[in-house]
Amino acid sequence: MGCNPPYLLSYRLRLLLLFTLCLTVLGWATSNYFVGAIQVIPRAKNFMATLHKVMYLGNEETLGHGAAMKKAELANCPSVSPNLRGQNKLVFKPDLTLEEVQAKNPKVSRGRYRPEECKALQRVAVLIPHRNREKHLIYLLEHLHPFLQRQQLDYGIYVIHQTGSKKFNRAKLLNVGYLEALKEENWDCFIFHDVDLVPENDFNLYTCGDQPKHLVVGRNSTGYRLRYSKYFGGVTALSREQFFKVNGFSNNYWGWGGEDDDLRLRVELHKMKISRPKPDVGKYTMIFHTRDKGNEVNGSRMKLLQQMSRVWKTDGLSSCSYRLLSVEHNPLYANITVDFWTAA
């Protein structure tokens, strides 16, 4: 009388088995979902890491794993370094050698330096056009390396040497420097630097901003006054994007003069405004020299300036042809030697 009928017990048993089976399937599906989700996260992280390496041209790999981890842990350097001294009295020893300068800069290797105490805010390439100015180069390197180190910059110095006896082409050498330097590092900022100008005040920051910068407000040879109101020569700073936007310098200025004004016109054409440091900061010493043979005044410079607005798109980085003879990494700088087989 008190027992359940056999068919009722069988029904309840089947229901219990079905419920247990559903729970098992649900648990298995949920487990696989979370395992799959966990596996996706490392793949996403790996993708972002790979993208970062591509953006920075594999720079972390060149440091090695330990150094890369150490760099990642560093805090950013301040916008104004605490190591700056301000106005510096420059001394040029007549018998100074490159080996002496090298001994004073043991942390510079292959022309490269980065601060150990913090992560630099910008990677800066200094481009120096050069021919037959070995003594000037030694003097500039002697003062420029500690100058840049006090500013806590991640920097590299490139000397672009024009071989042969054809007329000197400063602008084209700087285009070459830009193109070749980018093969080694995705530089943020480029400093286009004459070899005979040495900065006196390290508050004159060798960094790039939202607008192109002209760093030579005055020099000893002009009584520390600007040469003329729209002067844009000597030492200038443009970001990678700014220089690319204006298609770099013209390649057609053979001999002395005009190429800086051409670059200024390109900058103005693109609605960019040139900034300068304060006069007591943007001070330089020009090392005296006579005009070099092969760097005579360019008699065509005014005509070329008048053509700028018509030719800037086709005359510049996009048309810079040269024969690369060598790239040598000396302790204090990278030396890029090129030959220009045509001249105006």
Swiss-Prot record:
Enzyme Commission number(s)? 2.4.1.-, 2.4.1.275, 2.4.1.90
Q: Which residue ranges run through the membrane?
A: 13-38
Positions of UDP-alpha-D-galactose binding: 129-133, 168-170, 195-196, 224, 256, 289-291
Cite the annotated pathway: Protein modification; protein glycosylation; Glycolipid biosynthesis
Swiss-Prot/TrEMBL GO biological process terms: carbohydrate metabolic process; glycosylation; keratan sulfate proteoglycan biosynthetic process; lactosylceramide biosynthetic process; protein glycosylation
Residues exposed to the Cytoplasmic side: 1-12
| Any GO MF annotation of the entry | N-acetyllactosamine synthase activity
Q: Where in the cell is it found?
A: Golgi apparatus membrane; Secreted
| Record keyword Disulfide bond present | yes
Spell out the disulfide connections: C77-C118, C189-C208
This protein's major location comes to Golgi
- Pfam families in alphabetical order: Glyco_transf_7C, Glyco_transf_7N
Cofactors (names): Mn(2+)
Reactions catalysed, as given in the entry? N-acetyl-D-glucosamine + UDP-alpha-D-galactose = beta-D-galactosyl-(1->4)-N-acetyl-D-glucosamine + UDP + H(+); a beta-D-GlcNAc-(1->3)-beta-D-Gal-(1->4)-beta-D-Glc-(1<->1)-Cer(d18:1(4E)) + UDP-alpha-D-galactose = a neolactoside nLc4Cer(d18:1(4E)) + UDP + H(+); 3-O-{beta-D-galactosyl-(1->3)-[6-O-sulfo-N-acetyl-beta-D-glucosaminyl-(1->6)]-N-acetyl-alpha-D-galactosaminyl}-L-seryl-[protein] + UDP-alpha-D-galactose = 3-O-{beta-D-galactosyl-(1->3)-[beta-D-galactosyl-(1->4)-6-O-sulfo-N-acetyl-beta-D-glucosaminyl-(1->6)]-N-acetyl-alpha-D-galactosaminyl}-L-seryl-[protein] + UDP + H(+); 3-O-{beta-D-galactosyl-(1->3)-[6-O-sulfo-N-acetyl-beta-D-glucosaminyl-(1->6)]-N-acetyl-alpha-D-galactosaminyl}-L-threonyl-[protein] + UDP-alpha-D-galactose = 3-O-{beta-D-galactosyl-(1->3)-[beta-D-galactosyl-(1->4)-6-O-sulfo-N-acetyl-beta-D-glucosaminyl-(1->6)]-N-acetyl-alpha-D-galactosaminyl}-L-threonyl-[protein] + UDP + H(+)
Question: Binding residues for Mn(2+), per the UniProt record?
Answer: D196, H289
Residues that carry a glycan: N220, N335
The broad enzyme category this protein falls into is transferase
Q: Which family does it belong to?
A: Belongs to the glycosyltransferase 7 family.
Subunit architecture: Interacts with SLC35A2/UGT1.
Q: Which purpose does this protein serve, as stated in its record?
A: Galactose (Gal) transferase involved in the synthesis of terminal N-acetyllactosamine (LacNac) unit present on glycan chains of glycoproteins and glycosphingolipids. Catalyzes the transfer of Gal residue via a beta1->4 linkage from UDP-Gal to the non-reducing terminal N-acetyl glucosamine 6-O-sulfate (6-O-sulfoGlcNAc) in the linearly growing chain of both N- and O-linked keratan sulfate proteoglycans.
Output this protein's name.
Beta-1,4-galactosyltransferase 4
Name the lineage: Eukaryota, Metazoa, Chordata, Craniata, Vertebrata
